[in-house]
């Protein structure tokens, strides 16, 4: 498998074309960004940690019947993935109120929600990824049919059930997470991008300690140490 051309570079990853038109390579970067990339830093080894964490969680979800773009890891920070036409919607699933939800609705921080809340955000850097509803998504033609929005919600909730149960065994509360989806060569919606402490909030169930990118956002502690702890707990549960 050879990289042939840089297809896309985002805040956290580079996506490379390969000599197989249906296969790409995702290279996880060591960069850290927050607040629409107004805050930036580098953390050596962070890309490798996110690659390993994402690979483990993709495998877990595949075992539970949720299709993903994951094929295999080929280095510490490189993952072979199936090519997918990305849907420009970020699907956010919330179990505990924190972050923007508390600011928008005045729900006290740390409130357990009565059910998993699924939100859509328009993936658009220039507009700062605004919160949208189903009608917005249809008007913007982000999906072909309303049924695809229902599929995104269903998949978001299914992923939440699997991950919540898994992280419970790791003594972590899955507070919320962001996932992205794409369509494979046959038009099936599959989970893409990554699942890592960059895109999830994890709170220790005993101490309440944050083990995710909020440490960087709010200068609360060492990101690499936290990500290493998340990987350690994931590995232990999967053994």
Swiss-Prot record:
<comment type="similarity">
    <text>Belongs to the SAICAR synthetase family.</text>
</comment>
<dbReference type="InterPro" id="IPR033934">
    <property type="entry name" value="SAICAR_synt_PurC"/>
</dbReference>
<keyword id="KW-0547">Nucleotide-binding</keyword>
<dbReference type="GO" id="GO:0006189">
    <property type="term" value="P:'de novo' IMP biosynthetic process"/>
</dbReference>
<protein>
    <recommendedName>
        <fullName>Phosphoribosylaminoimidazole-succinocarboxamide synthase</fullName>
        <ecNumber>6.3.2.6</ecNumber>
    </recommendedName>
</protein>
<keyword id="KW-0436">Ligase</keyword>
<dbReference type="GO" id="GO:0009236">
    <property type="term" value="P:cobalamin biosynthetic process"/>
</dbReference>
<dbReference type="InterPro" id="IPR050089">
    <property type="entry name" value="SAICAR_synthetase"/>
</dbReference>
<dbReference type="GO" id="GO:0005524">
    <property type="term" value="F:ATP binding"/>
</dbReference>
<keyword id="KW-0067">ATP-binding</keyword>
<dbReference type="InterPro" id="IPR028923">
    <property type="entry name" value="SAICAR_synt/ADE2_N"/>
</dbReference>
<dbReference type="GO" id="GO:0004639">
    <property type="term" value="F:phosphoribosylaminoimidazolesuccinocarboxamide synthase activity"/>
</dbReference>
<keyword id="KW-0658">Purine biosynthesis</keyword>
<comment type="pathway">
    <text>Purine metabolism; IMP biosynthesis via de novo pathway; 5-amino-1-(5-phospho-D-ribosyl)imidazole-4-carboxamide from 5-amino-1-(5-phospho-D-ribosyl)imidazole-4-carboxylate: step 1/2.</text>
</comment>
<dbReference type="InterPro" id="IPR001636">
    <property type="entry name" value="SAICAR_synth"/>
</dbReference>
<dbReference type="Pfam" id="PF01259">
    <property type="entry name" value="SAICAR_synt"/>
</dbReference>
């Amino acid at each position: 498998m050879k990289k042939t051309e840089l297809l896309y570079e985002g805040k956290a990853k580079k996506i490379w074309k390969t000599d197989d038109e249906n296969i790409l390579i995702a290279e996880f970067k060591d960069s850290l960004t927050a607040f629409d990339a107004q805050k930036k830093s580098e953390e050596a080894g962070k890309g490798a940690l996110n690659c390993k964490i994402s690979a483990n969680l993709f495998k877990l979800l595949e075992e539970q019947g949720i299709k993903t773009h994951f094929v295999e890891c080929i280095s510490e920070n490189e993952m072979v993935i199936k090519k997918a036409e990305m849907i420009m919607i970020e699907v956010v699933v919330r179990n505990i109120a924190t972050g923007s939800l508390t600011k928008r609705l005045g729900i006290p921080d740390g409130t357990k929600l009565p059910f998993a809340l699924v939100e859509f955000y328009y993936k658009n850097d220039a507009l700062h990824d605004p919160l949208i509803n189903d009608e917005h998504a249809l008007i913007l033609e982000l999906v072909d049919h309303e049924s695809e929005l229902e599929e995104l919600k269903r998949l978001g909730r299914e992923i939440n059930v699997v991950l919540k149960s898994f992280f419970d065994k790791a003594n972590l509360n899955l507070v919320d997470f962001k996932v992205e989806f794409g369509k494979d060569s046959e038009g099936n919606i599959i989970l893409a991008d990554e699942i890592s402490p960059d895109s999830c909030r994890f709170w220790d169930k005993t101490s309440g300690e944050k083990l995710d990118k909020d440490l960087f956002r709010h200068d609360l502690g060492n990101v690499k140490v936290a990500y290493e702890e998340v990987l350690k707990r994931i590995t232990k549960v999967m053994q």
